[in-house]
């Protein structure tokens, strides 16, 4: 059976870089994206948000990567991604995440992986918005 394509929220990418536990769900998701182990979706604004977060000085101090190293990771992610253009969608629970809702609306089979509790609790997207641990558990 083919796995559905996923959208990976920025908080999962950042947590994957920050964790010291290689077996943690966020680390496994980031490693899977870098290794093209499952299909995932990007678009320009999401990749830009990944970059903006990963190169923040406070985060760089914690993950220890240079800007060039962070950009190399982003390049790898972009090379393995399915690129889609977002479409209009219902309002997201958090207006700052509207672009994720619009990307989710592009295809009925997409699933969003996030650690954002507000997004995870959205009743209208139940089953389409899952936690990193739920994604990893379903993959096993």
Give, region by region, the residue ranges found by the protein language model.
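Short, active-site-adjacent cap segments at secondary-structure transitions
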Residues: 13-14, 48-49, 119-121
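Acidic, PIN/NYN-like endoribonuclease modules and their adjacent C-terminal/linker elements
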Residues: 90, 94, 105-113, 117-140
């Amino acid at each position: 059976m083919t796995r559905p394509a996923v959208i990976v929220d920025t908080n999962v990418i950042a947590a994957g870089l920050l964790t010291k536990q290689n077996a943690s769900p966020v680390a496994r998701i980031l490693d899977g994206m870098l290794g093209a182990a499952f299909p995932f979706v990007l678009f320009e604004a999401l990749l830009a948000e990944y970059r903006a977060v990963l190169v923040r000085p406070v985060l760089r101090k914690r993950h220890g990567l240079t800007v060039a190293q962070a950009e190399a990771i982003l390049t790898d992610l972009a090379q393995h991604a399915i690129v889609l253009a977002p479409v209009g969608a219902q309002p997201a629970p958090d207006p700052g995440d509207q672009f994720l809702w619009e990307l989710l609306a592009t295809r009925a089979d997409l699933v969003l992986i996030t650690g954002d509790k507000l997004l995870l609790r959205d009743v209208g997207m139940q089953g389409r918005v899952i936690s990193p641990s739920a994604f990893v558990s379903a993959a096993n």
